[in-house]
Amino acid sequence: HRQAQSQRARTLGMLLLPLEADFSIPLRRAPNVKEACAEAYGVGEEPSVVSLRELLGVIGAHEWRKKGVDIPVLGDRIHPHYGVFSPVRGEYIGLVAEAPLPTMKLAFDIGTGTGVLAAVLAKRGVKHVIATDQDPRALACARQNIARLGLLGRVEVVETDLFPEGRAPLIVCNPPWLPARANSPLEHAIYDPQSRMLLGFLNGLAAHLEPGGEGWLI
């Protein structure tokens, strides 16, 4: 099964489709992918080509962004953007929703992505959550989700590499789990080259925890 999947991925990666500057596909009966491509790539400037594999990923990300992912503990949906990890499998969210909280005062969410864990902590009653990321896609995604959930007064989204300034009694992190280099922006959310983020979190945790604080690696 894995071999068949790998072969399919290679085949889709070798098939190239033309895109006009406005992201239209100049082929008969081609679908309209303008909005999906604009969300993924920004403003088009010149004609280009894209692999079918990449384009299918762009379309899939667009659909997830439109309909969102249901998060039962929030009683609402999270809308992931292209290149930002989608919380489709929510086991780790359940852990954060149920684990005893050491504080209701302050928490850091490192590598927030969609902002889902920051939102869960805020919904549980943490008064101030600082959610960090350095990826522009993730920052925009988290800010939109936090605003839509009505949590702007409790969750602050900050652009920084790993930790914000200061210390907190609770620091959570759900890093990408594959220690390899991503082949496309769509894969960026699940790859951590040379475990850089994981090691950075572990090595910097003690310096950013308050005495007696807790770090949750999820």
Indicate residue ranges for each PLM-predicted region.
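Glycine-rich S-adenosyl-L-methionine
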Residues: 185-210
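Conserved beta-strand signature within the Rossmann-like core of class I S-adenosyl-L-methionine
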Residues: 212-218
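Conserved RecA-like P-loop NTPase ATPase core
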Residues: 80, 146, 174, 201, ...
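N-terminal auxiliary segments of SAM/dcSAM-dependent transferases
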Residues: 1-69
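Conserved SAM/SAH cofactor-binding pocket of Class I
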Residues: 89-173, 179-183
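Soluble or luminal CAZymes and related metallo-dependent hydrolases
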Residues: 4, 119, 134, 193, ...
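Class I SAM-dependent transferase core
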Residues: 53-101
